[in-house]
């Protein structure tokens, strides 16, 4: 049974990775959180405390460390210092510490399509990472590319455990009683649900996937179409109004040839089913499940 250590286990991606992998009952899981324990026995870590990080790695000796820690767009705008340390520097620190303290282990790090400007779309490995904002540039610098570790470049949507999430999914549900919301028809997306990311991580562990990999279903969808699909899947009463909005296309071409990402409708229905089975986690969304 492989041992997996999940950093940032209380976040949007981290909690889903934990609960999905736990449901498979084939891993011994350890979780690391910033302030509040996810499971009652999580390690609590200030990421500036490298001594505690070393102790956690030495004590658990995980086969895989999944890094779900990150400063998002708003946080990056608020604190460039935090964005540089957490998004750019910390993934490389983790990779270095793993090599020094854990035998035969690897890092799985989550990157973003926001390393691209969104001026072109259908981005591949050959395209220049041309983002000019703090978030995009720091995530660019944080991509760990070597012969041992794995960086998954993607974009995610999914539920939050906290009340003040900033993702698109949480924004929609937080405003579900509004009469109407704007959906951007000129903003193109090609990401996955957090549940699908968790499934991909299971695949990556099983197949020992390494290097830099891009994750998508190779299908483009506008933010307007995506919001419409979410409202239909979760039976939300709000009307989505089509507006041009922000012009951006950060769609990426998937590179994981042996793994098939399903359609958006299937991903969202799978997410709905997962959330319905785990209502205790998602009390703020409960009426929609």
Spans of features found by a protein language model:
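NAD(P)-cofactor binding segment of oxidoreductase domains
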Residues: 59, 78-108
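N-terminal Rossmann NAD(P)H-binding glycine-rich loop of SDR-like oxidoreductase domains
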Residues: 2-24
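Amphipathic terminal alpha-helices
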Residues: 263-289
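NAD(P)-dependent short-chain dehydrogenase/reductase
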Residues: 132, 144-189, 195-196
